[in-house]
Amino acid sequence: MKQPVRVAVTGAAGQIGYSLLFRIASGEMLGKDQPVILQLLEVPVEKAQQALKGVMMELDDCAFPLLAGMIGTDDPKVAFKDADYALLVGSRPRGPGMERADLLKVNGEIFIGQGQALNEVASRDVKVLVVGNPANTNAYIAMKSAPDLPAKNFTAMLRLDHNRALTQVAQKAGVVVADIEKLTVWGNHSPTMYADYRFATANGESLKDKINDPAWNKDVFLPTVGKRGAAIIEARGLSSAASAANAAIDHMRDWALGTNGKWVTMGVPSDGSYGIPEGVMFGFPVTTENGEYKIVQGLEIDEFSRERINFTLNELEEERAAIADMVK
């Protein structure tokens, strides 16, 4: 059996946390031979801390062979101590009458604090995934607040958009999700994201040719994927928690264990690829190997794609401007 690794999860007693923790403890994220120590953070409010205790009781009651230990805390420095993986799930949701700029600032404070704590106490190789929205900008803030950690250690979750897009394309083309390769999502985790199946194949056959419906792409597919979160809230009365947790597991598993040459989507700090300014936390097609991701290079960006990529980039630049005074 391998040595246990430390997995920190914030917002651990929330809806996504509840869908996530049992799957991490069962080995779905890091493999069936990798013991884990869960380091769980919740806000310093009695109700949240009580809820966290209850979740930890349930984790105990599963008797997971891979769960080598557990701590619950309201202190980021305790939660992130020597963490090998950190899933930053907790964030402040948008309240009634709250402007997006206010939301960015409120979350900015949270992610500055968490970035600083990671900088101080986490493993120098910590892999950080930001799930809490606005995910790209929160990840950017955490990254900027942790100057002693490599920027590449910080990522944002675009995998939910990616998975949503996979299913829509599979249903339209009459193929199964497992056969689809080379789909990606560019940009921000928001309705401006650009899901792109121009290079996608199913069993080697081009999906763009198979679907061959530009109007569907523009008027049905992109809005459906972009607004899926809102559609789920409307249907369920609650936000998508299980599918978000599933996407977080997918993102971390692929980053840690590799994709065998398959493309996945990750929000990563840009290295200047495809004209995206360096440092912007942006969804790209990537492949992963030995715990490192690489942006897929050399893809042709046609006029429609450039428009959509610029549209989502502009939103990210606006978000970055709104919190510019908060980060160096």
Curated annotation (Swiss-Prot):
NAD(+) binds at residues 11-17, 107, 114, 131-133. The keyword Hydrolase does not apply. One of its GO terms (molecular function) is L-malate dehydrogenase (NAD+) activity. Belongs to the LDH/MDH superfamily. MDH type 2 family. Disulfide bonds: none annotated. One of its GO terms (biological process) is tricarboxylic acid cycle. It holds the Pfam family Ldh_1_N. The active site is at residue 189. The keyword Transmembrane does not apply. Catalyzes the reversible oxidation of malate to oxaloacetate. This is Malate dehydrogenase. Its EC number is 1.1.1.37. Substrate binds at residues 94, 100, 133, 164. Gene3D superfamilies: Lactate dehydrogenase/glycoside hydrolase, family 4, C-terminal, NAD(P)-binding Rossmann-like Domain. It is an enzyme of class 1 (oxidoreductase). Keywords: NAD, Oxidoreductase, Tricarboxylic acid cycle. It catalyses: (S)-malate + NAD(+) = oxaloacetate + NADH + H(+).
